[in-house]
Regions:
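Active-site substrate-recognition segment that forms the wall
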Residues: 1-126
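C-terminal lid/capping helical subdomain adjacent to the catalytic/cofactor pocket in oxidative enzymes
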Residues: 124-199
Length: 199
């Protein structure tokens, strides 16, 4: 904003408070080695393995959970109600987890775009690029997001007019086309978005 680079950005972003909780995996489950990322929309959570045979459990923003929009500099503590809700939801899928005596986890702030789809684009200021509005869902896409941004930057710096002819990137592993126009700053809100961490 200080450089005036955001003057033509049509999609807004806002800070959203999030909690991800950390619980020990039952030894017999060996989630640290055999676990996988799982989105459980029936229970409103996602889980993924963490080091030391632990489980990370976060929210998929079910309708019953209010969203907590905060100041960008927000710092917070784990809220007992949120911790209990997510751990009990995890127990519906994995009853052997139980309810740990100690609450552990992290509190952070997601940078959420209006349609929960990130903005990967150039700006109206030459040499300024943005990768913003990535919500919480882009931690798993960091590698390909970096690749796409590098391709976009190289194309624009070499004279490509991304605004009138969106850069097309080929996925390095899938060889599928990625239309960078889907992530541009001047798009309208995508009505087909899940409007959630799923993107």
């Amino acid at each position: 904003e200080m450089a005036g680079a955001m003057s033509d950005v049509a999609i807004g972003t806002a800070p959203l408070r999030q909690e991800v909780h950390h619980v020990p995996s039952p030894q017999e489950l060996d989630f640290g080695n055999r676990g996988f990322n799982l989105a459980d929309d029936d229970n409103g959570i996602y889980v993924r393995p963490d080091i030391g045979n632990n489980i990370l459990v976060g929210s998929t923003e079910p309708e019953c959970d209010p969203l907590h929009w905060v100041d960008a500099n927000h710092e917070g503590q784990i809220q007992p109600e949120q911790w209990e809700a997510q751990v009990l939801r995890l127990n519906r899928r994995l009853p052997a987890v139980g309810v740990p005596h100690q609450r552990k986890g992290v509190v952070g702030v997601y940078d959420v775009a209006d349609d929960w789809i990130p903005i990967y684009d150039k700006t109206c200021v030459s040499g300024f690029y943005v990768a913003i509005g990535t919500s919480g869902n882009q931690f798993k896409n960091a590698g390909i997001a970096g690749h796409c941004m590098a391709e976009l930057i190289m194309a624009v710096e070499n004279g490509h007019d991304h605004d009138s002819d969106p850069v097309q990137v080929t996925g390095p592993h899938t060889k599928l086309n990625i239309d960078m126009g889907n992530f541009r700053r001047t798009r309208t809100v995508n009505p087909n978005s899940s409007m959630s961490v799923h993107g």
